[in-house]
């Protein structure tokens, strides 16, 4: 989405001049791997949740275990819509007891995407707020195909990367002020994202980038942990340790051996994800976890079916959300049993698993 010259840009040139600096190669590469997510927009929840995780487990989540509500917020300060969808447990929860995940989608996504995670989290007692970023969302795929490169270029601007962080902040402000906000334990708020959304998650969790010699810190102190799925590097910013070493919250990193972003002249593969894992929090004594699936693809972690292998795709999705929930229970409830058991339960799928504790 291009800037409106009649609107003031809250990110002036001194901080975010409009060049494709951090994300251009990564975003355009993601487009080569991803198409708009196929996610159903209709939810038909009914009461009666259980916190027990069935095993073996179907990918589809019982609709009686969660509710879903869409919001169409508008940030008047930035003159920017902030759509979102909130998944909640169907079972009644006491005030101040629910953890909350705030999820950021990849390029071309929407609030309806990554529903396999949102529904599952809610069915297991965790709220999940999926935020839509209007400057890099599914609108990219609409319009004249000949102008798609221009729309992608707009999505790759530094100002859009910064807007995405502000989208998460604004959505978090709004949901905590809403009636549902009373349900959440504000000490247990976790940021999560896939691909471009993982970059957004790193920024709101404490990653520090430089722009024209000025260091930008976009850390939101309400974030207590982060889940990074298929995280690309900060393109053109050099050593990731300079950006990520100061992150001071626990992190979960999920990728696959074939999690590769590739276009002519640019390749980002597993080693980039490993470099991000190694750099994250390297100056801090904070826990971090890495899971690398065998094979797969970059888009296997979206709602798309079949990518990365028709049989492998649902198995990786199920294992991903089980690990994410185990991470949340470990970090937020100090219950590490499920996380410790996870690599054994999914040994046939996992190429590498690391759990680093201070």
Spans of features found by a protein language model:
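Alpha/beta-hydrolase-fold serine-hydrolase catalytic core, especially in secreted/extracellular enzymes
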Residues: 293-358
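Primarily recognizes the serine-hydrolase "nucleophile elbow" in alpha/beta-hydrolase
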Residues: 171-246
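Active-site-adjacent alpha-helix of alpha/beta-hydrolase-fold enzymes
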Residues: 245-318
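Short substrate-entry loop that stabilizes the transition state in hydrolases
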Residues: 93-96, 103-140, 235-236, 261-264
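Cap/lid segment of the alpha/beta-hydrolase catalytic domain
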Residues: 134-163, 302-305
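Bacterial N-terminal signal peptides
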Residues: 24-33
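N-terminal cap/lid segment of alpha/beta-hydrolase-fold proteins
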Residues: 45-96
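Alpha/beta-hydrolase active-site loop
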Residues: 151-182
